[in-house]
Amino acid sequence: MKVGQPVLQCQTNSEAFGMMQERRSGNYKPNIWKYDFLQSLSSKYDEEKYKTQAERLKEDAKHLFIEAVDLQGKLELVDCIIKVGLASHFKDEIKKALDTIASSIKNDKSDAIKNRYVTALCFRLLRQHGYEVSQAKKSDFLDENGTFLKAKSMDVKGVLELFEASYLALESENILDDAKAFSTTILKDINSATTESNLYKQVVHALELPFHWRVRWFDVKWHIKTFQKDKSINKTLLDLAKVNFNVVQATLQNDLKEISRWWRNLGLIENLKFSRDRLVESFLCTVGLVFEPQYSSFRRWLTKVVIMILVIDDVYDIYGSLEELQHFTNAINRWDTAELEQLPEYMKICFKTLHTITGETAHEMQREKRWDQEQTETHLKKVWADFCRALFVEAKWFNKGYTPSVQEYLKTACISSSGSLLSVHSFFLIMNEGTREMLHFLEKNQEMFYNISLIIRLCNDLGTSVAEQERGDAASSIVCHMREMEVLEEEARSYLKGIIGNYWKKVNEKCFTQSPEMQLFININVNMARVVHNLYQNRDGFGVQDHQNKKQILSLLVHPFKLD
């Protein structure tokens, strides 16, 4: 069966119908993003004249690096460029500016940076770009007694930047841990009546989710609108950011239209009514990983992977009987169509679709990236088999009514979260010219992928546990901790949020020290953790297509900026 052609139609009989009566339901709402609407998307910003306009504005904006002569000016320019989504356009200029800053700080033994806001901003930007920089010195934020300065001794911008910087902490950086606690307390006490409105909105935004944990592209519009109210921000830079956003959005619309045609022609969801039909949400996840226009192929192929993750997850979580799941897991492990005879029709459809997508992905990676097709397919089949085995373990827990310890839960969850599955697919989809050295890099960074996978799982649990408990799903990490430690849900949630913070520290150890040629892949993996923070922040981003989800999709994929 070719992906893009209709899948087999389900056959039902009285016995199968009897089994269907006992099936569980996820109670997922129908898809709200209809095919005709997606195909109607169009943008004038894919015209060449807007790309030319962006190039002209880009050349004009380069002068800003020359005009920014002092340390604070350089730092704020770099920060603004990153936040409005223009970092890829000014890579060389940003590197040159940060190289100069890092060198001047390293050679200056007089501790010349006295402005606490600048100290924190400098630390954050240097660390997130891979420069070796130690946690802020005690003298920068502590008084002579070794305690943090009182709120009245620090301006709001300084406290806010200290808060943001604290989220780039590594393990054992106790000063930054104290800085996070201190700045969080201060920011929560800030009154809107006594704080400039634009700054107050930034404080609220940061407390909802810190910048380091946010998906950069998802926040671009918010930052542009925020900077528009700041008279110190150069208008040319903001004009460029708006045009760039619209040009990128035009490419994303074309990507989405193409993948929606594939999805409709596939016909998979019509035969699997129990599963989530979430094409647009799946595509948006890939946009969160890498949004630049030149990565259209990556987004389209990885969207197919995300779609299959959702479908197979629903097979294990919601619909399949334990006996069926055993046969399905065996079939995936052996990757053998001979196993299909023991599978019900809906599982045959899942297996054949996955089999075809995986084969076509490996073939495409050989054509586009010069990876060995057989080698690629071997790696992809392995991560799918690992994923299904982990889901089967959780299905057995559910069927036995078993609640594991948190440690036992996480051992399986790091695989069932799909983090490693997405990492391996991303590796082959994004990296060029497969070599042993590159594959060694994949193996060498397993610890980072492991920590990102656990962030994915725990964020998922925090966002979906209420709905899962209502459905009677298997125990989440929240329930596991509640029962293991005999605590209430609120305490369990607080504990797991702390664990997420610790895993981020482990990720921080690895994600700022990679070589330039590997940095894109590392960024994609870190963005996986950021995407799930966005998806499951106070909601189930896949299960429920609520107002917040719809608003974000319309903003990022449908509505362009109005240009002056």
From Swiss-Prot:
It is an enzyme of class 4 (lyase). Mg(2+) 2 binds at D313, D317. Binds 3 Mg(2+) ions per subunit. Keywords: Lyase, Magnesium, Metal-binding. It holds the Pfam family Terpene_synth. Mg(2+) 1 binds at D313, D317. GO terms for molecular function: alpha-farnesene synthase activity; magnesium ion binding; sesquiterpene synthase activity. It catalyses: (2E,6E)-farnesyl diphosphate = (3E,6E)-alpha-farnesene + diphosphate. Mg(2+) 3 binds at T464, E468. Catalyzes the cyclization of farnesyl diphosphate to (E,E)-alpha-farnesene. Belongs to the terpene synthase family. This is Alpha-farnesene synthase. The gene is TPS7.
